[in-house]
Amino acid sequence: RSRGLGDVYKRQLMNNMNKRTFLSLLLCVCCLSFLHAERVDMQQAGADVQGRKLNTALINSTIDRLNAHGGGTLFFPAGTYLTGSIHMKSNITLELEAGATLKFSENFDDFLPYVEVRHEGIMMKSFQPLIYAVDAENITIKGEGTLDGQGKAWWTEFFRVLVDLRDNGKRNINKYQPM
C-alpha cells in the first residue's frame, strides 16, 4: 500500500517534535541540577569566624556531604577561619567574600597524616597541602577573600632544620621526619 505525502509529513513532524521534546527535557534537567547545588554559609553552619578554633573538621565534613549530593558551594562570609588541610572533592566551590580569610594553622600536626605529593618531579610523602585534591574535577576557589598559608612558621622550621643539620650534623631533625 502506498503512503501519501500527508503520512510522510506527519511522521517527520512527529520525529521533529520528539527531538524538540527530548532537547527541552534535557535542558530542564541541566538547569535543575545547577539550581539544586547547595550553598552552605559556613558561619551559619557553626564555623568559628574569630580565627581561634580549628574549623577543619566542619569544612571537610561539609565538603564530603555536598560531594555525596553532587556538589555545592562553601560560602565564607567576612571573618577569619582557622583550618588545617582542606580536602577538596569533585564539583565543590570555595567562595570567600571580601574580608574573609582562610587562615591555615601553624601547627604542623594539623597537616597529618602524610600524603603522596610531587615536588620538583619527584613523588614523595609529605605534609598535606593547604588545599588538597586527588582524582577530583570541577573544583573552584573564588571570591575576594584571602588564603593565608602562615608561611613564616613553615619557613622558620625549614631553616631551623637546615641550620641544625649544617652545624650539628643531626640526622633526626624533627619529630615528623626522623632520618
Where are these regions (language model features)?
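Extracellular/periplasmic carbohydrate-active domains that bind, remodel
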Residues: 30, 34-179
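Small/flexible residues
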Residues: 3-5, 21-22, 168
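Bacterial Sec-dependent N-terminal signal peptides
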Residues: 11-40
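Single conserved hydrophobic/aromatic residue that forms the stacking wall/gate
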Residues: 1-12
